[in-house]
């Protein structure tokens, strides 16, 4: 079994390398038209440059997974701004995509928690479609629309989960099929459990991203890992790639939903024990605060387990 690991957005080891530099609408609205355009271009350019820096860092450390920042392009979905961010940066987007393909990286996006399809408000669904389209446009500009995925949560319950899930069934129809085909769903830490999210994934043919930390914080009484994991694998069968699992650990016993700086191996070991009988490859996205540093430390700790072998900076051959 081969387990690969990746991190989110930026490498904390790198100096001043955030790919999510912001330009608020409040600031933008105070600028002249030309100044506003220049600010959009300048901020996006900086974020694309730092995305490249972060990718080179991952490659140099042999880390095979990476999640792009959703904030690469400022104000891309703001109703009063929405601008053509692809044309001025065709070269930069293609350079990123070429680098990803050349080194065989697995990449993804994670639109924010407001991108959901369970709301009773049509405007929320419209905004979700706009946001998913924005992320797809970036994948398309990188020529990665056949490789990358966009991961979101099911959404809110609004006091009635059954009705909310029925709205999901209807609202998701507004998402163009080619964009929905690049979508995954993840269980969350407060509302939709692993089993509930799996049910939606199986119904709609959407791959299931299992978040172990969320599962611990928001668990069905009868949800055994031994039952969840085989079903998770099944949702990825048609993709031809391993499933993805999110890894993090609680900041403290009281702050169980907050992410710690690193990943506590004792917290995640039950998951690895449950995965062992499956005998399948898995990719893991580290969601700890220290990102790349947390990843490298966890990989080192896991590879020290007798029988395991580290075969790359972010890859372990796990003893069957």
Swiss-Prot record:
Gene3D superfamilies, per the entry: Divalent-metal-dependent TIM barrel enzymes (3.20.20.150)
EC number: 3.-.-.-
GO biological process terms, semicolon-separated: nucleotide-excision repair; pyrimidine dimer repair; response to UV
Enzyme class: hydrolase
Keyword Nuclease: yes
InterPro entries for the chain: UvdE (IPR004601), UvdE_bac (IPR023520), Xyl_isomerase-like_sf (IPR036237)
GO MF annotation list: endonuclease activity
Keywords from the UniProt entry: DNA damage, DNA excision, DNA repair, Endonuclease, Hydrolase, Nuclease
Keyword field contains Hydrolase: yes
Source species, domain of life: Bacteria
Physiological role: Component in a DNA repair pathway. Removal of UV LIGHT damaged nucleotides. Recognizes pyrimidine dimers and cleave a phosphodiester bond immediately 5' to the lesion.
Family the entry assigns: Belongs to the uve1/UvsE family.
PANTHER family: UV-DAMAGE ENDONUCLEASE
NCBIfam families: uvde
HAMAP family listed in its UniProt record: UV_endonuclease (MF_00606)
Protein known as: UV DNA damage endonuclease
Originating gene: uvsE
């Amino acid at each position: 079994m081969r387990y690969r690991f990746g991190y989110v957005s930026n490498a904390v080891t790198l100096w001043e390398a955030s790919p999510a530099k912001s330009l608020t609408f409040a600031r933008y609205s105070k600028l002249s038209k030309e100044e506003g355009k220049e600010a959009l271009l300048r901020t996006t350019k900086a974020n694309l440059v730092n995305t490249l820096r972060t990718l080179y860092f991952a490659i140099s450390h042999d880390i095979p997974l990476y999640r792009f920042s959703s904030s690469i392009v400022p104000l891309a979905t703001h109703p009063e701004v929405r601008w053509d961010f692809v044309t001025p940066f065709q070269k930069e987007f293609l350079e990123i995509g070429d680098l990803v393909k050349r080194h065989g990286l697995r990449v993804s996006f994670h639109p924010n928690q407001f991108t959901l399809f369970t709301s009773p408000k049509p405007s929320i669904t419209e905004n979700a479609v706009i946001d998913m389209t924005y992320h797809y446009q970036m994948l398309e500009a990188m020529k990665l629309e056949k490789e990358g995925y966009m991961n979101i949560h099911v959404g809110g319950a609004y006091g009635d989960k059954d009705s909310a899930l029925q709205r999901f069934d209807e609202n998701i129809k507004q998402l163009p099929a080619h964009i929905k085909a690049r979508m995954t769903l993840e269980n969350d830490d407060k509302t939709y459990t692993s089993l509930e999210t799996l049910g939606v994934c199986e119904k709609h043919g959407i791959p299931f991203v299992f978040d172990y930390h969320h599962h611990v914080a928001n668990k069905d009484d009868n949800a055994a890992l031994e039952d969840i994991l085989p079903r998770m694998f099944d949702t990825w069968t048609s993709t031809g790639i391993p499933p993805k699992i999110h890894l993090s650990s609680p900041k403290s016993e009281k702050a169980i939903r907050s992410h710690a700086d690193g990943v506590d191996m004792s917290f995640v070991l039950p998951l690895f024990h449950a995965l062992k009988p499956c005998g399948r490859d898995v990719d893991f996205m580290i969601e700890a605060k220290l990102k790349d540093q947390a990843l490298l430390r966890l990989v080192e700790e896991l590879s020290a387990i007798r029988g395991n072998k580290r075969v790359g900076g972010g890859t372990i051959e796990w003893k069957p």
